[in-house]
Amino acid sequence: YKADIKIYDKNSALSTHSIKETVNSSNIIFLSVPTPANIDGSIDIRIVDSVLSEINRCQESDSIILLRSTLIPGTTQFFSEKFPKLKLVFNPEFLTERNANKDFINQSRIILGGDKKNTNSVAELYNWRFQDKVPIIQTNFQTAELIKYMNNTFLATKISFMNEMKMIGDKINVNWD
């Protein structure tokens, strides 16, 4: 593999190429955009939709697009039906903001959801990059999306649990040091 990395960002100061150049000269596109929470707890997928619309308009190549953002189960299928010419794979990131580079290099597993032909192509890239040392789970869109949601929920549950234990400990004079 030869990695010729191109970066497109809406902030042109961070871009190395236009979106059209990036999309049409890439075999695999990593798409990481925010999916902020709405007041009711749902997620806002308008940014993902907008970027996929733009890619759909300018794509002349056969690139695979990795959706890395947190999406509720069923969302990638929705986008796959809305943009049938796009080859989508849901590939959630399990990165912390503080250690994103380190977390990417030291992944415990890679989740790929989508059409088997597309996930196989992406798995080849990851196997090459990580020298077959990181387990790769290939599944469908919905399962991959649920794995990501379960991971996020489990982390939140652990934090809530420890906060509760701290409150109990404080009431009974537990020494946390």
State each model region's role:
Residues 8-9, 67, 163:
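Active-site flanking residues adjacent to catalytic metal/cofactor-binding acidic residues
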Residues 20-26, 105:
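A short, aliphatic-rich alpha-helical micro-motif
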Residues 4, 80-91, 96, 100-177:
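Internal alpha-helical scaffold of NAD(P)-dependent oxidoreductase catalytic cores
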Residues 12-17, 73-75, 117-121:
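Short, charged/polar "capping" segments at the starts of alpha-helices
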